[in-house]
UniProtKB/Swiss-Prot annotation:
UniProt-annotated location(s): Cell membrane
Ranges annotated as spanning the membrane: 33-53, 104-124, 132-152, 153-173, 186-206
Pfam families: SpoIIM
Membrane-topology descriptor: Multi-pass membrane protein
Protein name (database record): Uncharacterized protein MJ0706
Length: 214
C-alpha cells in the first residue's frame, strides 16, 4: 500500500512539473527568489562595469576572463563559415551545460551569475555600446532571463535540500516536495528559453556578426 501511495504521489508530482500552465505560473509564485537573483545580476553588472572602467586591475582581470571565454568558444569549433544548424547545436550544448550546472550549484550559482555579469560589463567596456547591442542583445534578452531562472531554480532546490537535511522550521515533507517541484519547473522553463536563445544566436546574431566582420 505504501509503495502504491508513493508511486501515486510521484506520478502526480511529475504530471504537475511537466504541466505547461504550471511551468509558466512558476515564476510568479517564486518571484521573490527570481527578483533576488535578478538583483544580484544587475548590481554585479553595474558595479563591475564601474570597476572595469575606473580600475586597471579589474580591466586586466577582465582580459583574462574574456580570453578564457574566447578559448571556450573556440573549443565549440564555430566559424563564420559554419552552417546555422551546426552553430545552433553547438550553442545548445553549451547553454544547456550552463543551465544544468547553474541548477546543481544551487546558491553557488550566484557566482556564475557574477562571472557572466563580469563578461558582459567587460564586453560593453571593451567593444562599445554599438557592438554590445548588435552582438549580445538579440539573444541576450532571452538568454539572460534563462540564466536567472536556472539559478533561481538552483536556489529553490537548495532550500528544499536544507529543509530535508536539517529539518529546519517548516521543513515538512510537503514543503520539501514543493521546493523541488518549483525548482524543476523553473529549470524546464530556463531550458526552453535557452533553446530559443540558441536559435536566435545561431541565426540572427550570427548573421549580424558575419556582416560586421566580413
Amino acid at each position: 500500500m505504501r509503495d502504491a501511495y508513493l508511486m501515486m504521489v510521484l506520478m502526480d508530482a511529475l504530471k504537475e512539473i511537466f504541466d505547461l500552465k504550471e511551468i509558466l505560473k512558476s515564476p510568479i509564485r517564486n518571484k521573490k527568489v527570481i527578483l533576488f537573483v535578478s538583483l544580484v545580476f544587475i548590481l554585479s553588472l553595474v558595479l563591475l562595469y564601474i570597476l572595469v572602467v575606473n580600475i586597471k586591475y579589474f580591466s586586466y582581470l577582465g582580459d583574462i576572463i574574456f580570453q578564457n571565454f574566447q578559448k571556450h568558444v573556440e573549443n565549440l569549433k564555430i566559424t563564420l563559415n559554419e552552417d546555422n544548424l551546426h552553430i545552433i547545436l553547438a550553442i545548445w550544448k553549451n547553454n544547456l551545460t550552463v543551465c544544468i550546472l547553474n541548477y546543481i550549484l544551487g546558491i553557488f550559482s550566484l557566482f556564475v551569475i557574477a562571472v557572466n555579469s563580469y563578461i558582459l560589463s567587460y564586453v560593453l567596456y571593451k567593444f562599445g555600446a554599438e557592438s554590445f547591442i548588435y552582438l549580445v542583445l538579440p539573444h541576450g534578452i532571452i538568454e539572460i532571463p534563462a540564466l536567472i531562472l536556472s539559478a533561481s531554480g538552483g536556489v529553490l532546490f537548495n532550500m528544499g535540500l536544507v529543509n530535508f537535511l536539517i529539518n529546519i522550521k517548516f521543513g515538512t515533507k510537503r514543503e520539501v516536495l514543493y521546493y523541488i517541484k518549483e525548482s524543476l519547473k523553473l529549470l524546464i522553463l530556463s531550458i526552453i528559453l535557452f533553446i530559443v536563445a540558441g536559435i536566435v544566436e545561431g541565426t540572427i546574431t550570427f548573421k549580424i556578426a558575419k556582416i560586421m566582420f566580413s
